[in-house]
Amino acid sequence: LTRSRGLGDVYKRQLNNYAKLVNNFATKLKCKIIFEPGRSIIGNTGLLVSKVQFIKKGLNKNFIILDAGMNDFMRPALYDAFHKIIPITKNSSKMKSAIEFVGPICESTCKFGVYKKYQKLIENDFVAITNVGAYGSSLSSNYNTRPLIAEILINKNKFKYIRKKQNLQKLINS
């Protein structure tokens, strides 16, 4: 018997209810259950911090163009996956129309999320795309000749580079 697909991300489930259901099932069948936790362990551990490069005004919504692209984080492009986007600096001003967060790659799938209401952003503001710990790095690529971004491990008040940002020479040599 396989449940398949792992447990999923923490933000989409109620673990206690799930555990009770599985325990009842296992007790009745007198079987051993083995879990492959999937992205439930690290899915919510990563953030992709991105800078607002430009705001393009549209008729029905504005486009917030970030410096991160689909090559840096592919899940929204591949699976239409939702990842909450939070501003690094909060303010009380609101955008006047809906917004869509997009990347700088000229592809229709280089987008991260649509919000009907969001705080006002300006160029050079920073936002964080949440829950990118699972598959964020492993799905990243040099698509469109874009260098791989830096990865930083933060533990309390200390940080360490896991991977430094790829420079152009390393990109060409690879």
Outline where the language-model segments fall.
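Glycine-rich and small/hydrophobic secondary-structure elements
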Residues: 15-26
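Catalytic cores of soluble, metal-dependent hydrolases
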Residues: 8-9, 24, 28, 32
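Single conserved hydrophobic/aromatic residue that forms the stacking wall/gate
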Residues: 1-11
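C-terminal helical cap(s) of enzyme catalytic domains, especially alpha/beta-barrels
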Residues: 12-15, 146-147
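Charged (often Lys/Glu-rich) extended helix/loop segments that serve as interaction or gating elements
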Residues: 21, 30-174
